[in-house]
């Protein structure tokens, strides 16, 4: 009887340990994506198209208030300054993971130079990433204009 109880106890501890490690892995991946998203905003502000080209998936799409563009078009917009993402103040971030896909929501105030003017707009930005080998690639980025009281549900 003691052997059975000890065996069950060991199985329970092993199962709980595995769940804790899995939870730590998810938290690590979430933090990695939060950091990557923040870096992306800085690369956009710096017009660092080399770093962005490596991040953007070949089939990526970018949805803005005035249109939808592919990877090449988005990089051209950034490089030429047609839209200059000067500063993204990130107020909140939420991440959801499912296998090799991740969705990152950013609640931001974006200062951008557009059509000759500086504009400040509140957005919730939805980013979809896909894990390829050991790297996350941005598949889609969508800007949704929102009120400044909008909250991301966690």
Regions found by a protein language model. Name each.
Residues 1-7:
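Positively charged n-region of N-terminal signal peptides that target proteins for export
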Residues 7-17:
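Bacterial N-terminal signal peptides
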Residues 21-54, 59-154:
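A beta-strand edge to alpha-helix "cap/lid" segment located at domain peripheries
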């Amino acid at each position: 009887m003691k052997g059975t109880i000890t065996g069950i106890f060991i199985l329970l501890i092993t199962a709980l340990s595995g769940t804790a490690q899995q939870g730590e892995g998810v938290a690590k991946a979430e933090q990695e994506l939060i950091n990557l998203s923040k870096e992306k905003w800085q690369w956009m502000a710096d017009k660092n198209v080399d770093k962005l080209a490596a991040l953007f998936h070949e089939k990526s799409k970018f949805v803005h208030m005035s249109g939808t563009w592919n990877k090449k078009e988005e990089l051209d917009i950034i490089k030429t300054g047609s839209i200059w993402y000067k500063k993204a103040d990130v107020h909140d971030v939420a991440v959801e993971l499912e296998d090799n896909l991740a969705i990152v929501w950013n609640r931001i105030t974006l200062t951008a130079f557009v059509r000759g003017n500086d504009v400040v707009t509140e957005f919730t930005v939805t980013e979809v990433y896909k894990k390829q080998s050991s790297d996350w690639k941005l598949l889609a980025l969508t800007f949704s204009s929102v009120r400044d009281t909008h909250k991301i549900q966690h």
